């Protein structure tokens, strides 16, 4: 639908240079995540963005495989994508897909928060954790290719997000990996915050949602600067916004629609229908046969 809408508007004034990119937010999991031990494992978020039709095909295939591996966790359907599946898919799609570390629900931000206290209390152990984070980033750069994996910062006044943003900036410098700024948009406009809150509470009434999702809407550059400049400085924030253009420049215009391709089925027109029926009736599944002749 997004591509159809774009196709109908792309020639209008104000749409010059606009691009639509499609992707998927997946659960990127280790292979010990199963229905049996699902309560002892997390389902970390990860972002995939298709830069062209071939990349979109790869993401679709990966999503199909994840659904085959699905299971219920609490009241939610979980569809894990294993690291090995991502590796296998990306082996054929380098340059077609961009990856991003995602929100606080991602594997890297979660690990940074999980061991935050060690930074002050046990520097030696924290150094090992920090190295594992650098290794994870290097692993992603290897899978996606140089310049196709990004660290994702997000605007927020929450202490957890501010801490993670600072650490991602440090990782960016130490691993030579570009960072971007996104808003993890769950709703369109700031005025929609209350509606979004009511929607979430209708599903999980005891869940605190207001503060966590207060900044997860589509912001202007000015709004992002208002949220982030005091913590990181104008130039750092502007660089994160400018880096999103690295993805824009890689993205191609593509369509998902195809021309109707009716297969050619050769028929022996010399054989009457009755002869054909007797010849093939045993190959018709009983369920189909019953449906055909129930009247």
Task: Place the predicted regions along the sequence by residue.
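Phosphodiester-processing cores and adjacent nucleic acid-binding clamps
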Residues: 1-295
């Amino acid at each position: 639908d997004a591509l159809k809408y774009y196709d109908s508007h792309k020639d209008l004034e104000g749409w010059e240079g606009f691009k639509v990119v499609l992707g998927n937010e997946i659960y990127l999991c280790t292979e010990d995540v199963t229905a049996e031990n699902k309560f002892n494992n997390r389902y970390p978020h990860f972002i995939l963005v298709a830069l062209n039709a071939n990349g979109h095909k790869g993401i679709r295939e990966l999503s199909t495989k994840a659904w085959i591996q699905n299971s219920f966790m609490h009241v939610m359907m979980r569809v894990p994508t294993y690291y090995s599946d991502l590796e296998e898919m990306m082996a054929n799609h380098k340059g077609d897909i961009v990856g991003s570390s995602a929100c606080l629900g991602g594997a890297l931000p979660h690990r940074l928060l999980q061991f935050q206290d060690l930074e002050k209390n046990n520097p030696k152990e924290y150094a090992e954790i920090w190295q594992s984070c650098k290794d994870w980033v290097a692993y992603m750069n290897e899978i996606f290719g140089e310049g196709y994996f990004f660290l994702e910062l997000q605007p927020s006044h929450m202490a957890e997000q501010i801490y993670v943003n600072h650490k991602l900036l440090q990782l960016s410098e130490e691993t030579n990996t570009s960072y971007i700024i996104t808003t993890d948009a769950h709703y369109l406009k700031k005025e929609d915050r209350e509606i979004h809150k009511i929607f979430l509470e209708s599903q999980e009434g005891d869940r605190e949602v207001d503060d966590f999702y207060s900044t997860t809407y589509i912001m202007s550059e000015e709004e992002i600067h208002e949220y982030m400049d005091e913590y990181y400085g104008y130039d750092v924030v502007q660089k994160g916004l400018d880096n999103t253009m690295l993805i824009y420049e890689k993205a191609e215009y593509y369509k998902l629609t195809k021309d109707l391709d009716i297969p050619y089925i050769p028929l022996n027109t010399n054989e009457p229908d009755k002869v054909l029926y007797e010849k093939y009736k045993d190959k018709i599944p009983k369920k189909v046969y019953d449906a055909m002749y129930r009247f």
